[in-house]
Structures are given as C-alpha cells and as structure tokens.
Amino acid sequence: MMLHAQHMPGQPGAPSLVFLHGFSGDCREWQPVGEQFHGCSRLYIDLPGHGGSAAIPVGRFADVIRLLRATLISYNILKFWLVGYSLGGRVAMMAACQGIPGLCGLVVEGGHPGLQNEQARAERRLSDGRWAERFRREPLTEVFHDWYQQPVFASLTAQQRQALTALRSQNNGETLAAMLEATSLAAQPDLREALNALAFPFYYLCGERDSKFRALAQEVAATCHVIRNAGHNAHRENPAGVVDSLAQILRL
C-alpha cells in the first residue's frame, strides 16, 4: 500500500523534494512553496487520514513510516530531501532517525523532537485523546474553532483563524482522530540524541513569533532559519520567506 501524492517532475539528476504537511492539511499545503523549485522533482504526499489518503488506516507511528517508504519506492525516488511541517516534520524526523535510503537532508518547520519524561507523555496522551474524541463526535467547525485557540497559534489573527477553521473542517473527523492517536507526541520517542547524530544536513525553520518552537530548535543540532513575520505555520504566513530559506539550504 502507498500514500496518495502529487508528483511534479524536475530535471534529471537533481534530488527530489518530498513535502509532508501538518495535521489536518493535505498535499496542497506545501505547493505554493514547492512550485518555486522547478529544477527539482516535487512529491507532495497526503499523510494517512488526510486528503487522498483519508481511507488508509494506521495504528502506530511505525505504520506511517512504512507507508512513506513504500510511497517513495513506488515513485522511484532514490535521492531526496524531506521537508515537513509540524506533524509532517515529526514524521520526517522519525524516518530520518530510523534510516531511510536515499535521504540527502532534512528540513523541519515547527516539528517537536519529542517529550523528555513519562509525565509529559501521559499528559499529552490524555490531551490528544480528548481532542480525538471531539474530532469523532462533534462538528469539525466547532472543534477547529477551539483547536486554533491553542497557545501555539496565538499569533494568528481572527481572520486567519476563521479561514483555517473553514479549510480544515473539510476533513473527515474519524480519520483525523485515528491519525492523531497513532502519531501523538506521546507515542513519539525523544529524538534529540538521534537527530544530533545524523550524518546529513539538518535544518530547522520556525516563525519569529513562534517562541515555543524557536526554543525547541536550540535543543537539536540543526541550523535554524527564523522566518520573519510568521508564527507557527511559517510557510503559510510567509511563503516567500520560506522559499528564500529553502533556496539557501538547497543552494538553488
């Protein structure tokens, strides 16, 4: 089984860019950024429970990594960079730390490297469980209205919150809930040590108004690019700034 994706060809010999969206996003999320890099082939993946992969079930984080590997093989992608935001960034870090053939480098935007103690994991498990139950039972417009009130989204304007709530409410609540549980931060190991031992380039992007993830970026051995005039979702709030950073990273 493979994940649904959109593939855009590039020049032969250049590494591919594989884009992974955040929770409740889909393969379109990264396209305003990725389509500025026509020289590289681009693969925009729908993660399980999302978009064209909504019906693909997963029970564990390991299932997501297995599906990612199968998808890359199916597109014959042998040399690539992983670029992931939030949930997609965590998937990218997990894949990189477990070893994935052909990976040239890693770019993570606002992805958490992992909780560091069991109490924090237990608290997160309870929190994610409550959100999952709401996604299953309540109208998505109501759930996402509250979702975007979380502190990590504090930099959003009321208009931005309304737009995101309308966009994300097009998802399937049941499949979002299943993916949230399978990939909960509580189910992710602390990746700091493994990330610091990576043998290939690792870059971290974060919005200048995203104080939580700017602090987390200092805990991993990554070169950090701070995106001006942006909060947690930097590639949505300032796509040109993220394009500039990626161009520097990829030397394009």
Curated annotation (Swiss-Prot):
GO molecular function terms noted in the UniProt entry: 2-succinyl-6-hydroxy-2,4-cyclohexadiene-1-carboxylate synthase activity
Organism domain of life: Bacteria
GO BP, sorted A to Z: menaquinone biosynthetic process
Keywords of this entry: Lyase, Menaquinone biosynthesis
Enzyme class: lyase
EC number(s) given by UniProt: 4.2.99.20
Short name of one Pfam family: Abhydrolase_6
Annotated NCBIfam families: menH_SHCHC, PRK11126.1
Assembly and binders: Monomer.
Annotated PANTHER family: 2-SUCCINYL-5-ENOLPYRUVYL-6-HYDROXY-3-CYCLOHEXENE-1-CARBOXYLATE SYNTHASE (PTHR42916), PROTEIN PHYLLO, CHLOROPLASTIC (PTHR42916:SF1)
Function description: Catalyzes a proton abstraction reaction that results in 2,5-elimination of pyruvate from 2-succinyl-5-enolpyruvyl-6-hydroxy-3-cyclohexene-1-carboxylate (SEPHCHC) and the formation of 2-succinyl-6-hydroxy-2,4-cyclohexadiene-1-carboxylate (SHCHC).
Protein name: 2-succinyl-6-hydroxy-2,4-cyclohexadiene-1-carboxylate synthase
